[in-house]
Amino acid sequence: MSKVFESKSLIEEAKSRKKQYETLEEQLNTLKKAFQGVADLGDNFKGNGADNIKDFFQGQAEIVDSWLTLVSAQIAFLNGISGDIKDQELNDSYVETSFLDHELPNGDLKASEIVSAHKEEIDSILSGISDIIDLDMYTLDDYADKMGDAQKIRRDTITAVDKLDESLTTEYQNLESLDNAVLTKYSVLMQATSNGKSASPMYYDKKAFHSNEVYKSVIEVENQGTTYIDAKTQQAEARRLQEKAEEEANKPWYEKTWDGVCNFTGEVTGYYDYKRATEGVDPVTGEKLSTAERVTAGAMAAAGFIPVVGWAGRAFKGGKAIYKTGKAAIAAEHALDAYKTGKSLDILKMTEMGAYGLVASNGFSEAVTGRDMFGNKVSEEKRKQGALEAITIIGGAGLAHYFDRLYQKNAPYVNKVSNESLISNIAKTTEEKQTRLQYLRNKHGVLSKEDLHHRINLRAEVLNELSRIKSSGLTKKQRGPAVAGVLDKKTGNYYFGINNIDGKPPKVLHPLIHDRIVNMPTELKEGYIKTSGAGSHAEVNALNEALLQRPDADLKDLMVYVVSARKINKKMPEGVPMPRCPHCEYITQNTNYIPEALKYGK
């Protein structure tokens, strides 16, 4: 279904609606005071049925409390809309999903056809003058990568709009239970004023009102509403602290004053962590921390980790509260790692050594000299802890960097080795760069413009499949490390696969796949151990499905592409091409496997 999203209009409407609820909230509070005034008359109001009447107005005040809970929940929901939009990275956006679903892909295809045609013409011209001057044919690598990136942005935008729409709609619909709760509660109150023949506040039975089973169910729903409001409050606080963390992250390290770091630390870690990092007191053990330890804790809080307390607090995950009618299911945790986005941590590493360097410097100072950054003596235990902390933080490369810059006189060999290695690597890289194009062409060959189109389309479809799998509810373990796609160039059909978590090949095997698994050379099968089982990987599952659909297919007509289904390591984030394992190389041999390094040409 086509959707139109405009962030500015939605946010403005939410603000307008919020003001209306705030006006209603003021009126309800006035009404509650009036009801409570009658209920609190005490001995000033006596006589036949007076106590029942006062109890009745106390019940009315309770009904108003239910209205106030409903209003507060609606205000909390409306307050969170702008944050929900930001979580999906749709700030200042206007999106028509029909355009992204249809017009834009058609435009991409047309653009690819035009670019390929132009390249063919230029290649023809360069070939015509090759006897005069030898020029390398240019490739479409950069174009393919940029088009792939653009398609990913398109898909991510559609997914973001769908997620936001579903999230807000579901959350709002769940709040309707509070509407029903108020009306039901009022109905039970009215029932409690009846004597069987007529209804009057004089006949009000407070015990009957509170013991009614329907009343008890309503109270449970209202408690969920209160929990929802608390969750939204925590959500708003988490978002505020994340913004503050990013603001702090963008400051140069030398602008992060001790007081500023203390205040920042106190806000992001909660009361206990505040006591530890800013006052130097552990509220659990009562131990007093040194000034150096407090500075270290403050710096590491700004950088994303508090060494005194570790990863502390409760985590607010997913950027939204989960509210379900009938169960008190609110997922709203509050933690430091929620406030530290990847971008924040990257910035917080700063220039040179930055905040991490402050801690490393103090740690090495304690280990080498037996004194902290302020010259105070530390115990043997603290010296060992300081060394371990510093080494853990900056790692082997950071260790060399630290000694190079701070202990050059005492560690000349480290500096010499580092410089010689650097010069060697630069020379090696220069030599490789001069022959890389020819090397890749010799190794991988070149692609026709038809295969270029196939590759772009296959890449897009595999990333679409990855997006679908991520939103399907499968855990990271269930979806495994890879998603593979196979394009049958003859039929234009796509087939997909993920790893079998039990390490088993497909239950129904194409004869070719079966033979290759069974007849795999022993040294190959036993020589590769980083697998749960030969034939269980994503590309084998996808290829097997394609062959089952067209058993007599020529393997050269089957194009295979594999990407990471999650972040494997720093060099292999989610969604990047993956190499095949030795088992899969053997099983999928002779297919049209597309490595990312492949160069295109005539």
UniProtKB/Swiss-Prot annotation:
Main location: secreted
Traits of the deletion mutant: Deletion of the ywqH-ywqI-ywqJ-ywqK-nfi operon has no visible growth phenotype, however it is out-competed by wild-type cells.
Residues in LXG domain copies: 1-235
InterPro entries in the record: Bact_secretion_toxin, LXG_dom, PT-TG_dom, YwqJ_deaminase
Cellular localization per UniProt: Secreted
Induction (UniProt): Expressed on rich and minimal solid media likely in early stationary phase; dependent on DegSU. Not expressed in liquid LB, but only under conditions that promote biofilm formation.
Keyword Isomerase in annotation: no
Pfam families given in the database record: LXG (PF04740), PT-TG (PF14449), YwqJ-deaminase (PF14431)
Coiled-coil segments: 6-41, 227-251
Record keywords: Coiled coil, Secreted
GO cellular component: extracellular region
Subunit structure: Probably interacts with cognate immunity protein YwqK but not with non-cognate immunity proteins. The interaction inhibits the toxic activity of YwqJ.
Cited function: Toxic component of one of 6 LXG toxin-immunity modules in this strain. They promote kin selection, mediate competition in biofilms, and drive spatial segregation of different strains, indicating that LXG toxins may help avoid warfare between strains in biofilms. Mediates intercellular competition during biofilm formation; disruption of the operon disadvantages the bacteria, but overexpression of the cognate immunity protein restores growth in competition with wild-type. Overexpression alone in situ causes growth arrest but not cell lysis; no effect is seen on DNA or rRNA.
The family this protein is said to belong to: In the N-terminal section; belongs to the LXG family.
Name of the protein described by the UniProt record: Toxin YwqJ
